[in-house]
Amino acid sequence: MRIRVTLYSEFKKYAPGSGSGPFDLNLPPGASLLYCFNHLKIPVNNEFTALINGRRASLYSLFREGDSLVVFPLICGG
């Protein structure tokens, strides 16, 4: 299944390739946010906020085809 991922601030370094802008990620059906973090090598001990389709997610939230994931640190300024 394919999801759209956007990483902000210190999390951008975990994006494949250039790390600039959103990217598509293929995951197995029923994958969780924890699986996604492990796949991208994002340490789970980082303080973060994750939104799936605009709703707050936990590490055990499950993805569905076409979902959108946004990850940013708890404190992030513009």
Regions found by a protein language model. Give the residues of each.
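Ubiquitin-like/PB1-type beta-grasp interaction modules and other compact soluble beta-rich domains
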Residues: 1-77
